[in-house]
Amino acid sequence: MTPLLELKDIRRSYPAGDEQVEVLKGISLDIYAGEMVAIVGASGSGKSTLMNILGCLDKATSGTYRVAGQDVATLDADALAQLRREHFGFIFQRYHLLSHLTAEQNVEVPAVYAGLERKQRLLRAQELLQRLGLEDRTEYYPAQLSGGQQQRVSIARALMNGGQVILADEPTGALDSHSGEEVMAILHQLRDRGHTVIIVTHDPQVAAQAERVIEIRDGEIVRNPPAVEKVNATGGTEPVVNTASGWRQFVSGFNEALTMAWRALAANKMRTLLTMLGIIIGIASVVSIVVVGDAAKQMVLADIRSIGTNTIDVYPGKDFGDDDPQYQQALKYDDLIAIQKQPWVASATPAVSQNLRLRYNNVDVAASANGVSGDYFNVYGMTFSEGNTFNQEQLNGRAQVVVLDSNTRRQLFPHKADVVGEVILVGNMPARVIGVAEEKQSMFGSSKVLRVWLPYSTMSGRVMGQSWLNSITVRVKEGFDSAEAEQQLTRLLSLRHGKKDFFTWNMDGVLKTVEKTTRTLQLFLTLVAVISLVVGGIGVMNIMLVSVTERTREIGIRMAVGARASDVLQQFLIEAVLVCLVGGALGITLSLLIAFTLQLFLPGWEIGFSPLALLLAFLCSTVTGILFGWLPARNAARLDPVDALARE
């Protein structure tokens, strides 16, 4: 008969300083299906090392070990995990149940890694617990169970995937005599059902219940009686549970890892919250700076647009401050007409200005009088609280009419409800008030100078007696490039004048400069916020490293029941990502509260959250979890099952 487990000249040595200590010395052993074998020996004899090699938790230094004819030396880590999952069931002296899982959930764990669907897992776990007399303890946690009950849960877990070979390491060592007898009775029942049962013990009474007792001393087998053929043995076991397809196994494993991650977070609420705090602050900082910074930028740009955007101002001279008399009369009315005919011009308004005295009854104030066209107010985004602007007839007839700003109206007519139609003196010229213009409130503040506007024809002909213009403001049509329009305007006037005796000021260039400046500032602040997010990520990595250390035994248990390294990696990586995602969601909520609070104190600001900003925030959370969770998850996946199980 072919042995189920076959060991030939197995040796296992461990480094001890500069030397190698040999624990197993040429072990040769055959174990047949359906046997109940006891391996006995004193502490340090090598029996636990032999059990680890039998259960594929450890590899021999040399020699050959075959399971059902398969040489385990040819298998990689994932194949060994599959072998443990499908052929072996472990029963440990200290039970090794996961404390945060119920009895039922502990029994389900091996089937999770086999890819069995949840409904089937649940039914099989309940069936096994019922068979072992624990049907009324399925929802109990390990701390709520007695030692004997915990060991029965451990046995049920060993049988979850079939348990063709049951490896029991001191199964009664931590139990009282009555519970120990119950456990041994269960092992006998399993033997009768066709399971191969291997008991590692130093208790002679337990060993005596086995059909064959193998004694090991100082790493060598000193007693190995031949296997006894059983007349009624069937040589089989209950069928192994059917594993699901690769896709279902992946989905089941992912869902279980997600569930386990959530349970781990819930089990340490305060630590989880403190871990999330760095992510919450980081995400809230990034989102708030992006959103509030964008609102501030739009506010600044709106103020600049209120001054007049997409406009080009033309002034006489070489540059600001140039008062050379030869350039003062450079701009003429003919230039204005020529500019208005250009296809890229939406409107062109001249400006003639002079500081004059305004008088009404006994009120006498200084003001800046500006001669403009009717388009001037549209160009600069001004509205009228009373009356209206000049019409073409008033421009052509040099009408003695005037538009006041709100400050001038308040100074001249503090108690009048309606000032349209009133007559004031502008310099020495009487003028009828036809409107009151309201300038947009700007975060840059308002000028202290009182301002009035007259038709440019009136200002130049009746007030100043000059035939030239102080400036021309050109509004470029939508769709035309402002910089190109500025170049064409410069060429036009240079050809007309025969020289360049003027200069231009493009407000669109100012707008672009401000946009660039605000973007740079916003980027700088975002980078500062990202630093806080990185600090939060480092905090997550630190806590996850601590978590891996604390849960080393749990990792060993999972590997013993069939978890692959990739399963462990996935679980801890998902846990890190989940911490960051929940922290990210709370961070976004905090940034919303910050934004709404700011809006209460800054009603003029339009603070809005774009879906892209929220998506980027969640993306940042996910990337942070992956980046800073990778190292702890990798460390967990690289743990040796034997070392992990030995940790306290």
Swiss-Prot record:
- Keyword Repeat assigned to the entry: answer is no
Kindly state which keywords UniProt assigns to this record, in alphabetical order. Antibiotic resistance, ATP-binding, Cell inner membrane, Cell membrane, Membrane, Nucleotide-binding, Translocase, Transmembrane, Transmembrane helix, Transport
Q: Which GO terms describe its biological process?
A: response to antibiotic
Superkingdom of this protein's organism? Bacteria
Q: Which Pfam families match?
A: ABC_tran, FtsX, MacB_PCD
Family from the record: Belongs to the ABC transporter superfamily. Macrolide exporter (TC 3.A.1.122) family.
The entry's function note states:
Part of the tripartite efflux system MacAB-TolC. MacB is a non-canonical ABC transporter that contains transmembrane domains (TMD), which form a pore in the inner membrane, and an ATP-binding domain (NBD), which is responsible for energy generation. Confers resistance against macrolides.
Name of the protein in its database record: Macrolide export ATP-binding/permease protein MacB 1
